[in-house]
């Protein structure tokens, strides 16, 4: 019988995470024409837990680079998940939509990791109950592949091809005390 050991690799450090967020902010400014007077109202809605602080940081960078203030909020997906039987129950998080609602806006959903696409599908269902934006886009810090649904991010900080058994963790200072992206691999003793 073989023993299992975990190897943790740091893929992005604090500086890498900061640069990645800045790059996504520039892409959002360019693609949404935020600095144009004809641009739709844009808001960033984070998916708890990692997407919420990422949305706030993106909004800060967007304002720093373009001078345009972008509303932020959060969309709780707990009741919209299709895997409730398979995962431990999560406490409900508040959904906070900026004043004026999401009708006739460009909503950019923000999450830390895009994996199967099920979290994003749940967020789309939750948004449908809140209003009808003109456009919905997706920004993620890490896209690790392995989609189970036909969902693609509009803004990707880092593409990290992984094995299904590997685990990608995004750590953010607001939640974890530091910024980093790590990959955990399960290795069997004796594997070379």
From Swiss-Prot:
Catalytic activity: UMP + diphosphate = 5-phospho-alpha-D-ribose 1-diphosphate + uracil
Keywords noted in UniProt: Glycosyltransferase, Transcription, Transcription regulation, Transferase
Origin: domain of life: Bacteria
Lineage of the organism: Bacteria, Bacillati, Actinomycetota, Actinomycetes, Mycobacteriales
Alphabetized SUPFAM superfamilies for the sequence: PRTase-like
GO biological process, any: regulation of DNA-templated transcription
InterPro entries: PRibTrfase_dom, PRTase-like, PyrR, PyrR_bifunctional
Protein name: Bifunctional protein PyrR
Protein function: Regulates the transcription of the pyrimidine nucleotide (pyr) operon in response to exogenous pyrimidines. Also displays a weak uracil phosphoribosyltransferase activity which is not physiologically significant.
Pfam families: Pribosyltran
EC code(s) of this entry: 2.4.2.9
Family assignment from sequence similarity: Belongs to the purine/pyrimidine phosphoribosyltransferase family. PyrR subfamily.
GO MF, one example: uracil phosphoribosyltransferase activity
Chain span(s) of sequence motif PRPP-binding: 107-119
Residue stretches spanning the membrane: none
Enzyme type, top EC level: transferase
